[in-house]
Amino acid sequence: MTVGVTYSRRAAAELEEITAFLLEYSPLVAQRFTAAIKRAELQLADFPNSGAPGIRPGTRRLIVGDYILSYRRRGADVDIFAVRHAHRRDARL
């Protein structure tokens, strides 16, 4: 069963900021990052528990390249609440 995948406002802003940074660095890198995020969304829609358990109860993490998508189930859907570079101290939400 495919579920919906949504982003919190904060996660959407983080994703936008990362994409803008990558666009300045290299449009090709930004394009590859965006494609990887889309693949991750499809994976979560089909397999919502495919990420590793997060530190906080009820959360999970999915690694996408150098980034970590932190998410939780909201009813039947998946809510991504953080998008962080893996080297950030707070990436392990």
Which residues are covered by each model-predicted region?
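Enriched for short, Lys/Arg-rich terminal
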Residues: 24, 64, 68, 72-93
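Basic, Lys/Arg-enriched alpha-helical interface segments
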Residues: 1-59, 93
